Amino acid sequence: MSMPGHGMGAGGPGGQFGSVMRSMRRDDSVKGQHVTRGTARRMFRFARPYRGILTWFLVLVTVEAVIGIINPLLFGSIVNSLASSHPSKQLVITLSLVAGAVAVVDTALSIGIRYVSASVGEGLIYDMRSQVFEHIQKMPIAFFTRTQTGALISRLNNDVIGAQQAFTDTLSSVVSNLISVTLVLVVMFALSWQITLISLVILPIFVIPAKRVGRRLSVITRESYGINAEMNNTMNERFNVSGALLVKLFGRPEEERDAFTSKAGRVRDIGVTQAMYARFFIAALSLTAALATAVVYGWGGVQAIDGALRVGTVVALAAYLVRLYGPLTALSNVQIDVMTALVSFDRVFEVLDLPPMIVDADDARPVPPGPATIEFDHVDFRYPTAEEVSLASLESVAVLDTTASAPVLFDVTFTVQPGQLVALVGPSGAGKTTISQLLPRLYDVQSGAIRINGLDIRHAALSSLTATVGVVTQDAHLFHDSIRSNLLYARPGATVAELDAALAGAQIATMVDTLPDGLDTVVGDRGYRLSGGEKQRLAIARLLLKAPEIVVLDEATAHLDSESEAAVQLALATALEGRTSLVIAHRLSTVREADQILVLDHGRIVERGRHEDLLADGGLYAELYRIQFEGQDAERVEEAS
């Protein structure tokens, strides 16, 4: 992940192969891609904090490239001394010691360059990942409902690493190779301009087929990324609790094995193909270097016999030639390298340029303190489209739904007084969940207003609004962490006594005490080590720890055993006591106790009142009661008897 292409001039054939391979593997289709204006300026601005260390990096690379041309001259001088009529032992020993010292310095420089490049490379990754993650956290919930999680993770991982690699590889490669090629050519022309020109004529024999192999290799590499992504996606879906449970319940392990081995086989096959093309590339470079070396020794040997050149000069020319072809080939791909860096950074900047829809207003202020009054004032609402949440420009982020957004709430007006419980009832798709999401300002309304204690929530500071409104969703989400950490998510500074009080209020303290690790018990992925009732009660405990003035609750529809149901009901009673509450009701006990019931149908409030009054009216609520609640009433009577 850090500047692996440095020091090609001094790296020998092995080092050249790796760097040139990376350059040839770049996809030259990037030359035709559109890059947003100003991307290059922003790219260098991202690297601005590392100007000092980058300066040291360039100095070290330059020094290494200069040192890289010394040893061939030393070895040539040693050969000349040995081939002379009066060889000098002292001279040979001295030159050998100098060559050894140069090798030690070169090794030390390479270690220093690696450290510097790693510091810059990993620093860039850290900075970009942190900024992208922080920015994605600010995006509205509509952004997450319309995009695939894997695509977002790819932006955070692959694109960020790709941008860093393209930038650091390109910088190190261009600087190192340019210096190496310049110095090597100067020395070679000084030693023998005729042999140097002949050697350069051979270069196209390698470059032309190498470019074709490189293009094919870039296509194969891109295909391998896609196939690997498919295989990884299969593992991701099957290795989580839900996926594994589904496979077992439907008895499909053999089919899953066959499907996975098929994908893994494709990964294997394309890996072999990729390795062979890479080998062809390296073989072509090695063959060209060998042919050129043969020419140097042949032509130079003849000139040495004729007395036009010394034997050591021929040896030095052959050594320089090996160091020349790799950097020249890499420099021929500079345009692709630069465009790859720009395209990679542009994809990262696309995410950073997404404007969050839900932000603090310029005049944002805290929610007025005290018991909370909720007011929905002629609210109309439709969910935002993909374009409105700024996904249209992200071509690689799969948009799950591109259809036009139809209105879902019409002229919704109601008031909840301090301490009151209002139940939302209605058929599926009536708008109950939408109302529950508008109050904590997960979305903004198109017209009308929502007020808490007289303040329009669009003018409330988000931190204050979040502290005022507590939400318990139908499927309570728990992180793969300890019970303690999941609870402290609501209030990081809570004491053990406060945690115990919250657990007791949620009717789950006894269960936690029976666990071997108590509060430090890890709940598993999404809390799968806990039962449905236990997850609900932990979510309620988390709410109690937060202690909001307003509670928004979406009751779970899952059927619980009578003991768990009773515990959940007691926990809910504790959570709602003394708080202004808005509840999507699925339990008969909730609608019976509600101060007001709002009956929704197709986004409108069609009935409102108390349980007994609405039943007597014989409208939609009475019909829903017969469908949804009457069975619960019968069960309650049966249990009582």
Residue ranges with predicted function:
Residues 24-31, 122, 130-154, 158-160, ...:
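Short intracellular "coupling" helices and adjacent cytoplasmic loop segments at the cytosolic face
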Residues 84-90, 187-201, 273-346, 351-352:
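Helix-loop-helix
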